[in-house]
């Protein structure tokens, strides 16, 4: 019997004769899902590298690499504890009275739940801006109880000298910024491994950990009362907020001091 070849279906083949129409739609979907998961995995890996410093514990080494987000973020200070905001309690702002030493607060106190995030012993502390470390109290030792009580009696009677304030601040890190302002971090429990005077640090880099050094609880050797005291000193040796007339003005000015994260 004759066959009408003009009515045969036309089959499109590759040079090797493979019929690509034989691949079912499900295989295309599986291939697309595989590519998506590969891209998502790479993106997540990059994000984890940027967040790695905030997950360190026990003084582990911190990479000096700066995530690309740091170079594109707006200028200004980052809060020294990620996620923190201005303390809700005015007593934790600069110029708030400190009657126990006949003076005023010279910085911001991040304590308890007043700053939008819990402040716990060992919470990572970051550099609020690029700068150079000019002080790092790695070998800090607490006063004994007798020395502590003597210091409190002295500042209650006569007010606190700069040396007295240094002892009251506990373990500290100071960072000098390119504009010659100095950031002071106080009451730290520990300093990041490898951090030393003269070292450059970058905004967002972990530099230390929240503690209670230089406080009653620190003297007693407990982990209670954890806080971070953070001061911003101007090149003319005045602290941020010093010339404000009211705490309301300090709070308003502080809103433009910090830009995140």
Go through each PLM region and give its residues:
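A short acidic/small-residue loop/turn micro-motif
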Residues: 141-143, 190-191, 215
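Surface-exposed, glycine-biased beta-strand/turn segments
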Residues: 40-170, 203, 253-261
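Structural recognition of the beta-strand scaffold that forms the well-ordered cores
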Residues: 109, 127, 173-176, 183-186, ...
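Hydrophobic membrane-insertion alpha-helices, especially the h-region
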Residues: 24-43
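Acidic, glycine-rich catalytic/binding loops that coordinate metals and/or anionic ligands
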Residues: 57-59, 152-154, 159, 163-165, ...
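N-terminal Lys/Arg-rich, disordered targeting/topogenic segments
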Residues: 1-23
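Conserved positions in beta-strands of structured domains
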Residues: 132-134, 189, 211
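Short histidine-centered loop motifs in beta-beta connectors
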Residues: 118-122, 126, 176-204
């Amino acid at each position: 019997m004759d066959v009408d070849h003009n009515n045969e279906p036309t089959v499109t083949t590759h040079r090797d004769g493979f019929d690509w129409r034989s691949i079912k739609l499900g295989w295309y979907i599986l291939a697309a899902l595989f590519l998506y998961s590969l891209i998502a995995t790479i993106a997540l890996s990059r994000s984890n590298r940027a967040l790695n410093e905030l997950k360190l514990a026990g003084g582990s080494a911190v990479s000096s690499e700066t995530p690309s987000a740091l170079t594109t973020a707006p200028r200004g200070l980052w809060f020294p504890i990620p996620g923190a905001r201005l303390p809700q309690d005015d007593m934790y702002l600069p110029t708030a009275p400190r009657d126990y030493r006949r003076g005023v607060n010279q910085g911001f106190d991040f304590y308890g739940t007043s700053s939008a995030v819990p402040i716990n012993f060992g919470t990572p502390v970051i550099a609020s801006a690029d700068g150079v470390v000019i002080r790092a109290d790695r070998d800090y030792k607490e006063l004994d109880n007798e020395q502590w009580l003597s210091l409190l009696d002295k500042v209650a009677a006569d007010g606190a000298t700069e040396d007295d304030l240094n002892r009251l601040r506990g373990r500290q890190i100071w960072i000098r910024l390119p504009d010659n302002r100095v950031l002071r971090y106080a009451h730290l429990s520990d300093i990041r491994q490898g951090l030393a005077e003269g070292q450059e640090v970058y905004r967002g880099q972990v530099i230390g950990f929240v503690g209670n050094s230089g406080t009653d609880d620190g003297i007693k050797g407990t982990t209670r009362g954890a806080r971070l005291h953070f001061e911003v000193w101007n090149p003319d040796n005045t602290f941020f907020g010093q010339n404000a007339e009211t705490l309301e003005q300090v709070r308003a000015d502080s809103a433009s001091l910090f830009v995140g994260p």
